[in-house]
Amino acid sequence: MNIKSLLLGSAAALVAASGAQAADAIVAPEPEAVEYVRVCDAYGAGYFYIPGTETCLRISGYVRYDVKGGDDVYTGSDRKGWDKGARFALMFNTNSETELGTLGTYTQLRFNYTSNNSRHDGQYGDFSDDRDVADGSVSTGTDLQFAYITLGGFKVGIDESEFHTFTGYLGDIINDDVISAGSYRTGKIAYTFTGGNGFSAVIALEQGGEDVDNDYTIDGYMPHVVGGLKYAGGWGSIAGVVAYDSVIEEWATKVRGDVNITDRFSVWLQGAYSSAATPNQNYGQWGGDWAVWGGAKFIATEKATFNLQAAHDDWGKTAVTANVAYQLVPGFTITPEVSYTKFGGE
């Protein structure tokens, strides 16, 4: 009701103003020139200039749908049916040139829907209460997954930890973190130096993140700290990072190497060590002191890519996953994947 009153009041004021000037000569304003949207190709495909500015904008996104069956590779429990999930991600990139370098922003919104198998608790369907039961669930959520600003080599905002991003993520598979290599999303202030000879270095002050069961954000003013070095060439790359968890006052490190055997076949290997032999920390979230991951990618055709990853940690957990990412048509990829987990002590 308040909004409607404001709109009516504004309309009345405009009519009164027009009536007061009725005796004046009416001069029609010159029509403004039409400004068409211009393509901006300086930062890649899909960018256009925001009208009236020299800032380039790209709007993109994806839709993903997962169907999972068999045992839960993270816990070992039997799903007793299908678990399904859907995600819509909406992404915005902006870039413009300044006297201090390229000023950029990146934002990603995620809309998630998850439906787990109900496993019949006796309240739905013709089953008795003595069945091996576990209630299913349906959940929805919206996350601001990324929101950061870049200027030159600086990055400020919500991103994923440099403990992951600087060395590179794990394999191109869905269940890549059965043996976790650290928490992901965090607030951070980071600077990356990039040399002209393939050498780069990073230093980051991070807030820490949280998962379903644990909160790894900092306690007080002292941030978590990450530093790393990398060398990359046509043959591949080698990178290492060291991270300090300011809450438990322990550190963790990772070293990773990638080798391009051919233009279609590549392999990678990563080893990690933590001074605290517990996964309840921000960085060294594998079991025990150490963990190792490795994988391979083979581009079989223009449409089909094979991916393989294996991992093992100090507590005896082993995880192996393989998939085939098949591009049915441009923009639509189907990825069948199979995973195996052997838990420590089995």
Curated annotation (Swiss-Prot):
GO cellular component, one term: cell outer membrane
Signal peptide as annotated in the record: 1-22
Pfam name, any one: Porin_2
Subcellular location: Cell outer membrane
Domain of life: Bacteria
GO molecular function terms attached to this record: porin activity
Gene Ontology terms: biological process: monoatomic ion transport
Keywords: Cell outer membrane, Ion transport, Membrane, Porin, Signal, Transmembrane, Transmembrane beta strand, Transport
Topology class, membrane: Multi-pass membrane protein
Keyword Oxidoreductase: no
Notes on the domains: Consists of 16-stranded beta-barrel sheets, with large surface-exposed loops, that form a transmembrane pore at the center of each barrel. The pore is partially ocluded by a peptide loop that folds into the pore lumen.
Protein function: Forms passive diffusion pores that allow small molecular weight hydrophilic materials across the outer membrane.
Quaternary structure and interacting proteins, as annotated: Monomer.
Family per record: Belongs to the alphaproteobacteria porin family.
Note: The pore formed by Omp2a is larger than the one formed by Omp2b. Omp2b pores have optimal permeability to allow growth and protection against harmful compounds. The larger pore formed by Omp2a may be advantageous for intracellular growth, when the bacterium is competing with the host cell for nutrients whose concentration is particularly low within the phagosome.
Entry protein name: Porin Omp2a
Lineage, opening ranks: Bacteria, Pseudomonadati, Pseudomonadota, Alphaproteobacteria, Hyphomicrobiales
